[in-house]
């Protein structure tokens, strides 16, 4: 019993890793009717930091707003928000779930705030990113990996 490793999950730090706001058509875009087509792309990743039990989890969101004909770009926003988490005594699927779903859920409100602030400072109407179910995205990715492995005759752990 004494040999069992205690499970530890701690948020160490949340930080803005990179951000960019572009308004390539300014000032002419401000004279156009505001009927944007908005495209939101999302990516998240996790990696071990150093030799210890710390992991960096990063969310990258790219938001592009174009006119209806998609000829002119109103704005392009890219935000990379990250956090450092201590994950000790938690392995395998449980750790993968923490890093692939739980941690991104913690970071996403910060991404939403940065995107909203940048768009407002660019003099555009408020952009509020809708909530994202990272648990469902994680499970979908996991199912896809298992399906690909099964097709190749391998097993996924």
UniProtKB/Swiss-Prot annotation:
Keyword presence, Ribonucleoprotein: no
A single cellular component GO annotation: cytoplasm
Top-level division of the source organism's lineage: Bacteria
Annotated localization: Cytoplasm
GO molecular function, one term: unfolded protein binding
Keyword Oxidoreductase: no
Keywords associated with the record: Chaperone, Cytoplasm, Protein transport, Translocation, Transport
InterPro entries: SecB, SecB-like_sf
Cystine pairs: none
Gene Ontology terms describing biological process: protein folding; protein tetramerization; protein transport
Family: Belongs to the SecB family.
HAMAP family in the record: SecB
Function according to Swiss-Prot or TrEMBL: One of the proteins required for the normal export of preproteins out of the cell cytoplasm. It is a molecular chaperone that binds to a subset of precursor proteins, maintaining them in a translocation-competent state. It also specifically binds to its receptor SecA.
Subunit structure: Homotetramer, a dimer of dimers. One homotetramer interacts with 1 SecA dimer.
Name of the protein in question: Protein-export protein SecB
Organism for this UniProt entry: Alcanivorax borkumensis (strain ATCC 700651 / DSM 11573 / NCIMB 13689 / SK2)
